[in-house]
């Protein structure tokens, strides 16, 4: 028969296409719509059967050539044209796969899918993070069709069906009578894995309700139709409950250019090679904290290396704490008599705990990573450890231990091996393993606003002083006059800046520069005659380099072809760099004019 169907592409070829409902998935659907007979013309070994008439017994490849020859003989062949077509090949044998109509086992999907759609309208639904991925679940449940669960594979759970002649038996146990033969097929792997949330907990007998429903499933968006959907409807059917409360979706790992990793491109990365060079914790921290939920991640070895440096920073900070606590005992631990810097770090710690817990609850691991990185590197290692060196009493040692312990606990989900190792060496700990210790809790009593502002002020002043000293290029050849009224603050600043041997008389006649910040002031006294010419020469060189670079960038950005054809992010980066260089040029010119 000649039939009309929207499957035919009117823009391709003649707009007319032959169909074989028994040998093509799309043709099968067309045949169903028009009640066409499904005529199988192949044997299971891919030779032609009696329905192929004169081609009966021929191999499929030979038969195709014979069909073309016959068309030529009958003057029915108009032309032969090569086209690009999707043809399935076996991954193992590299042989073309022929769709073949056969009897299989199916799951009737419509009742199961409707149950999912109903549950997702209630408060007892599966919450997707990000929420937009729920649409994939709903879409597949709306358009669902019966699911073929038979697979012709060696490995897998056997289909629980037995045959004896025309009789069929399905059950958990094999028939006791002789003569029954079990189905040779196995269950689709997604059918078996969809039972995971409850089958591992004792189902169908004595299921452990402490762990079901599971709290969260973490998976990629590419297998929502294959796995997530099926876990949801299997769980609803067998347990009358959802399999997990939250479903956290992550993206794919791509190469540095944003391409999907594949064998053909040769851009895949063996994680074992990365672990061998940088350690498992470096790779784990990079993968878990460098992208937002649902977003793809570009693999960047430099970022893994950066994480490795971060781990070394934490390791060295831990060594400092442990070395200073060699004789520290449990009875020495005290948080009494805290000074301002102790209160500062405890305030920063509790602010970090609050932000980390909030972000962990929302699965914003990228925010958690940035928050912990900033606190550990900037606040704990670079600032507090330096501040603590000038006051090594039991209170400061106790604060160091408390902060380090809470850092290890917060970092443990992202760096399990290093944190467990350091935790095992702590002189005082609540449990043998960090895995069974309590997670840090925000303590509003350890928020010291006034003391935090004071230390923030001092640290900003120290930064300003160092910047001014570098700008003057005075090295160690300078003296200072202090106008800091608070002697405790002055002592802290002088210790941090190593100024104790540089105090001089206010009346000394020499060039001076004032460093002032929020009520703190120190005058730097120096002899600039030695460095003036050298500094002027360096500034002139910097000015020339900036002018050359600005000229090059302006020429590039004035090229219409470049602006239109180059990636937008590259063009934008060029514009940003141009503006930065123009700003720096103004600074250099001002310095030269003031000399």
Tell what function each PLM region has.
Residues 426-595:
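C-terminal low-complexity, glycine/proline- and small-hydrophobic-enriched intrinsically disordered tails
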Residues 144, 190-194, 224, 231, ...:
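Short alpha-helical scaffolding segments that buttress acidic/His motifs in well-ordered protein cores
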Residues 3-166, 227, 259, 265-310, ...:
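Residue patterns forming the tRNA-binding/recognition surfaces of aminoacyl-tRNA synthetases
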Residues 1-45, 116-150, 154, 176, ...:
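NTP-handling and nucleic-acid-processing catalytic cores
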Residues 163, 180, 255, 288, ...:
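Acidic, turn-prone loop/beta-hairpin segments
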Residues 32-39, 69-79, 174-181, 201-212, ...:
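Secondary-structure transition/capping motifs at alpha-helix termini
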Residues 140-191, 195, 374, 404, ...:
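Gly/Pro-rich turn-and-neighbor structural signature
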Residues 52, 160, 216, 302-307, ...:
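Short secondary-structure subsegments characteristic of cysteine-rich extracellular domains
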């Amino acid at each position: 028969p000649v039939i009309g169907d929207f499957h035919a592409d009117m823009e391709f070829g003649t707009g007319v296409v032959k169909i074989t409902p028994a040998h093509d998935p799309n043709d099968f659907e067309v045949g169903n719509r028009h009640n066409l007979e499904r005529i199988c013309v192949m044997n299971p070994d891919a030779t032609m059967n009696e329905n192929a008439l004169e081609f009966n017994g021929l191999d499929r490849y030979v038969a195709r050539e014979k069909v073309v020859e016959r068309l030529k003989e009958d003057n029915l062949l108009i032309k032969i044209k090569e086209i690009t077509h999707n043809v399935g090949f076996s991954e193992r044998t590299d042989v073309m796969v022929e769709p073949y109509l056969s009897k299989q086992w199916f799951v009737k999907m419509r009742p199961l899918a409707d149950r999912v759609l109903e549950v997702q309208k209630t408060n007892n639904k599966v919450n997707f993070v990000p929420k937009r991925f729920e649409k994939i679940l709903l879409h597949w449940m709306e358009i669902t069709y019966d699911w073929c669960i038979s697979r012709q594979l060696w490995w897998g759970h056997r289909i629980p069906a037995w045959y004896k002649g025309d009789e069929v038996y399905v059950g958990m146990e094999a028939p006791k009578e002789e003569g029954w033969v079990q189905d040779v097929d196995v269950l689709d792997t997604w059918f078996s894995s969809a039972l995971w949330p409850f089958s591992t907990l004792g189902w169908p007998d004595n299921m452990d309700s402490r762990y079901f429903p599971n709290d969260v499933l973490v998976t990629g968006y590419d297998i929502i139709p294959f796995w997530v959907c099926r876990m949801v409807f299997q769980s609803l059917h067998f347990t009358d409950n959802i399999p997990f409360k939250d479903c956290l979706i992550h993206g794919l790992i791509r190469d540095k250019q944003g391409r999907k990793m594949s064998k053909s491109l040769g851009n895949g990365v063996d994680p074992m090679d990365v672990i061998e060079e940088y350690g498992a914790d470096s790779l784990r921290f990079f993968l878990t904290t460098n992208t937002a939920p649902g977003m793809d991640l570009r693999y960047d070895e430099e970022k893994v290396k950066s994480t490795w440096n971060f781990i070394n920073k934490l390791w060295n900070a831990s060594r400092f704490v442990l070395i200073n606590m060699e004789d520290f005992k449990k009875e020495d631990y005290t948080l009494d008599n805290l000074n301002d810097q102790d209160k500062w770090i405890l305030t920063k710690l509790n602010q970090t705990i609050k932000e980390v817990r909030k972000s962990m609850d929302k699965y914003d691991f990228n925010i958690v990573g940035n928050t912990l990185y900033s606190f550990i590197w900037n606040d704990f290692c670079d600032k507090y450890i330096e501040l603590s060196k000038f006051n090594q009493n039991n209170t400061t040692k106790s604060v160091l231990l408390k902060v380090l312990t809470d850092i290890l606990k917060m970092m443990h989900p992202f760096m399990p091996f290093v944190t467990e190792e350091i935790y095992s060496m702590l002189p005082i700990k609540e449990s043998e393993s960090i895995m069974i210790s309590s997670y840090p809790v925000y303590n509003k009593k350890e928020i010291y606003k006034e003391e935090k502002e004071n230390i923030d002020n001092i640290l900003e002043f120290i930064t300003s002083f160092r910047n001014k000293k570098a700008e003057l290029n005075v090295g160690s050849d300078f003296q200072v006059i202090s106008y800091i009224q608070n002697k405790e603050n002055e002592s802290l600043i002088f210790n941090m800046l190593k100024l104790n041997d540089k105090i001089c008389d206010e009346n000394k006649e020499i060039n001076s520069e004032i460093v002032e910040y929020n009520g703190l002031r120190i005058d730097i006294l120096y002899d600039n005659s030695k460095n003036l010419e050298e500094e002027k020469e360096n500034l002139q060189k910097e000015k020339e380099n900036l002018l050359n670079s600005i000229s090059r960038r302006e020429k590039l950005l004035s090229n219409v072809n470049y602006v239109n054809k180059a990636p937008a992010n590259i063009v934008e980066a060029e514009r940003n760099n141009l503006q930065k260089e123009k700003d720096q040029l103004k600074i250099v010119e001002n310095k030269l004019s003031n000399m």
